[in-house]
Design a protein with these regions (language model features):
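Cys-dependent protein tyrosine phosphatase-like superfamily
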Residues: 1-121, 133-170
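Ser/Thr-glycine-rich phosphate-binding loops at phosphate-binding pockets of nucleotides
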Residues: 126, 130-131
């Protein structure tokens, strides 16, 4: 999330917050690339079900601290395409997700606060919905322009269309 201009004329710091799909089943070389990039903290936002089916490759890697915060802890929540199709638009789903998981969102931001100097990777399965909401909140808190926040989210949506098929097959 680095390089965005804020409304005050500053820029968000690079190598601080990294939004990602789940790095499951990645090679040792790619793990090392994440490490060399500076990743020292990981926040995995996936459900328990998702963890079982796609274990996180950076969990237990070197000195990376791994946290699991299930942002779908509410039993009525799902991000599978068939389950969210009844929302008129995704904003209604996101509001419900935030309202239903306030404690989990607080835990995520406490991790950010407790790791002020670490490069933190946060991920869900596709890197779009759960991570997108967190990224929007971080960029908004940093004072970024609304159009940059929307642009950041929109790019992730386009980049992750292929992941939808994988999620449907889970």
């Amino acid at each position: 999330l680095g390089g965005y201009e804020t409304q005050e004329g500053y820029y968000t710091k690079s190598h601080k917050y990294v939004r990602s799909t789940c790095p499951s089943g990645i090679s040792d070389d790619l793990k090392e690339q994440f490490y060399q990039y500076g990743i020292r903290t990981v926040i995995d936002l996936r459900s328990d079900y998702e963890l079982v089916h796609q274990p996180h490759s950076l969990k237990g890697y070197k000195d990376i601290e791994y946290y699991h915060i299930n942002l779908l802890q509410n039993e009525n929540m799902s991000v599978l395409p068939n389950d969210i199709k009844d929302y008129q638009d995704l904003s209604g789903f996101y509001i419900f997700m935030i309202e239903a998981n306030k404690k989990q969102f607080k835990k995520v931001f406490n991790i950010f606060l407790n790791h002020p100097y670490d490069c933190t990777l946060f991920n869900c399965s596709a890197g779009k919905d759960r991570t997108g909401v967190i990224a929007c909140m971080l960029l908004d808190l940093a004072g970024c322009h609304e159009y940059d926040i929307v642009k950041d989210y929109s790019e992730s949506y386009e980049n992750n269309m292929a992941m939808i098929k994988q999620l449907e097959d889970m």
